[in-house]
Amino acid sequence: MVEQRNASVAIVGAGDYIGSAIARRFAREGYQLHLARRDGTKLDGLVAEIAAAGGTASAHSVDARSEEAITAFLDAANAAAPLELVVFNIGANVNFPILETTERVFRKVWEMACYAGFLTGREAARHLLANKGGSIFFTGATASMRGGSGYAAFASAKFGLRAVAQAMARELGPQNIHVAHLVIDSAVDTAWVRERIEQRTGTPPPADRLMEPESIAEAYWQLHRQPRDAWTHELDLRPAGEPW
């Protein structure tokens, strides 16, 4: 039986892989999990799985681009038990040649990958300041560090999110809030990723070129447990075989 803490973890962008793995990892430590994605019914299986293992989780349908929706979600999470960690994990990874990048595409990707992160971070900070501390983690990507061909919309949004995280870390660190940006610098091991790589190369991906969601989640847990006198702000994660 998991010993329950009087503390909440909220994940905005609780997808099937990284977000779900983070939820499972923190549920094992007794945190109350509050999970948000556009269609919250897609989280029913994960919520049931966590409950069956003795944990506590709730699913929420949230449009992270809505200030009202994000505010209501984090208010509810903090009311259930004081927030200790908020994770922003929305990707919006799309590839469009620059001449095919419409205004709508560019704006929507920015809203999902940057603006929604700002809303999440601001509202998380509001609660964590009242709670006298905690952590806010932003999931980044290779595109957070460099703009690849066809990734003008995605990379510009991820660059922006990284800047939001840096500014928040400098402002909030002295107030006992650990703000971190995690760069996921490789493909995550999923059936879809394996299929795409094999279609492109004609061979299965090497075992040392993919990241397991559970391994990524472990890094989030270790980061959250860091002592205040040795906080990491930016952490880049990649498998041993990934060229960089």
Describe every region a protein language model picked out.
Residues 174-186, 200-244:
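C-terminal helical subdomain
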Residues 15-16:
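Conserved glycine-rich cofactor-binding loop
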